[in-house]
Structure formats: C-alpha cells, structure tokens
Amino acid sequence: MKLWLVRHAQPLVDAGVCYGRLDVAADPAATRASAQALAQALPLHAALHTSPLQRCEHLAQSLCALRPDLASKTDDRLAEMDFGSWEGQRWDALGAHALDAWTQDFAHHPPGGGESVNHVMQRVAQALDSTRNSGQDTVWVTHAGVIRATRLLLAGQRQVQHAHEWPTEAVPFGAWEVHGLSR
C-alpha cells in the first residue's frame, strides 16, 4: 500500500505572506499541469483525499476530470496549519516578539491564536492512521505543513517539542512524494 503526498500548485499570493488556512486559489495553468502529470503516475482506483482549501480541491477536481476511476473526498484533517490572526499578514511584519513566542514553545503555542504544531501533528496522525487501516493506495492533495508532519509521523515521531525538529524542506508546488505504508 502506498501514500502519495501531493502539494497544491503555486498559490496566487504574494511572496512572504502567511497563508496557512487562508483560502487562496492556486495558479490554474500550474494546477492543470500538475493534474496531468499526476494522472499518469497514479494506480487505478486509488483513494483520493483532499484538503478543503480551494488550492487543493481544484487540483483534485482537475485530476478526477482526467481520471474517472478516481473520486475525491474532502478531509478537513488535511488542511494546512491555522495561523489565526497571522493569516494574510507578511511574515516580516509580525514582529520578533510574536515569532519568538512561537519558537520558544513550538509544540504548544498557537501562532496568531490559531493552531499549535502538536495539534497539527495529532490531526494528521489521525488521517494517517485511517489511511493505514484502509489498506488502499491513497492520494492526499494537501499542503507543505501536512506533508512535513506526515514525514515526521512516518519516521515514528508523533510530537514535536522544538522548532529545530520541524522539517524545513518542502515538496515543490504541484509535485508529490510517495511513501510505502504498512498496517
């Protein structure tokens, strides 16, 4: 059984803006290109789960249009991290005090009053456990934060204590990585 972790295409948002749970669209041409490439790579009848945010839903819809054997199911657990009042703000305008408060208690501090990293880890772990129990090849159309959390979970790490533990490398926009899963 395999899990495809697919990141949405390039969002239509200015560089340097925090847009975790902000429901911004992705570039339509890049979304179509990603769907076309992915449609050729996926096995028949894989389960397709998508974040409820439009930048992921549009990719899943484009993929289903190319692959009638796939049916998209929205899963709120695959949404990007909620940055609360930071959403839509420039990272460099948040101020050192706000960023320091988050990094000093990375596991539990909800940035901008949104969602803590360990809350993200818990909900992604629930989604991963459900996928494992399904016994079916599965595709997640999701976000960089969810993919990073999944990498940690697959490595056996169910919680993050410090900011330096959080992976910095991200799957490129519109790309994916594949992981083998066991029950």
Model-identified regions with their sequence ranges:
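Short, active-site-adjacent cap segments at secondary-structure transitions
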Residues: 12, 55-57, 80-81, 146-149
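Active-site-proximal alpha-helix that buttresses catalytic centers in soluble enzyme cores
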Residues: 2-67
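Phosphate-handling substructures
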Residues: 66-123
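Glycine-rich phosphate-binding loop signature in dinucleotide/nucleotide-binding domains
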Residues: 41-44, 131-137
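Active-site catalytic microenvironments for nucleophilic, acid-base chemistry
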Residues: 62-66, 130, 153-157
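Acidic, low-complexity terminal tails and accessory targeting/binding regions
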Residues: 1-2, 40, 81-92, 152-183
